[in-house]
């Protein structure tokens, strides 16, 4: 017997994850209309209707309750061609990335949205729920399959390196629920037997997905979106491609093509928004780059077995200011968010782990932040190299005051600063 409308509306206000997307997937596999009906049953008017009207009504809603409901709409578009579902998914993505996403590619404060652009009021120890970034990456993959957008690929890279990669403790494999952005906080990791948070599930799954969006294919083209050492086998084209790089610790990536027979193919290399003018060589010969950042460099030619492509993307230091407080900003080197390392003073056990004896400890964690941590940075947009000196060891820098600065993904078991107090020089 059908549920009364008020009962069903009350039920779907809760966080039910991706069950509606799962029903759409079952419909795709079976063609059984009952699954499509069930997916539609979980349509949440209060969430989806404002997006249909192109309104940012996110307010203080629970972030990861919201994103899977949009993912279901993206899947609905793919299966039914519903134009409203496509438009609202794209509007939501652009709204999230443009007005609700911090520099590392994460969103939310204490699991909730905040008013558009009001970032400086929400730099807390409870920012950046991992599940939210996991699902935004998932939505990004849907959007890129609809249209090969370098903007979407830029975000994917930013979130993958700065949030997902740095979310796992390299010493134990444990993962963090939040990515704290308050100065002086540290990452808080799960424990092996007592922390079964949602972000443990999505966290572990995320680290099995690094190969998922390196390459995309069109009918006669290949998109190279991420610069990650990898091998691609495209059986239909008789193509094997090998990518070799130490990015982001080096600026160059090298691709070698192995072909059963010569073939014409457009290889599309992402030209990131953060890059200076790239240099491109095919079999050692320079190729003129006419494109602009946030586009694709297209190498459309007849390829032969053993052909080589070498691309160098110049990286530079930059300060990304908060829109509501330009005196606060995050340091980036290329797509990599840099953090100042602030040591371990005041970190009391069970730090850096969650306390299994306290329910939802990650949500009320006391960081015991010491006073007087060096979180200010004299900054000069014209001469950033005067502010930060590279030490020659990977992506390691040091400030004039002696604070070591590393990629955020490399800072573990220590306090850090991501959003600096900027003092203009």
Map each language-model feature to its residues:
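Long, well-ordered core segments of solenoidal/helical folds
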Residues: 1-4, 34-54, 88-105, 158-169
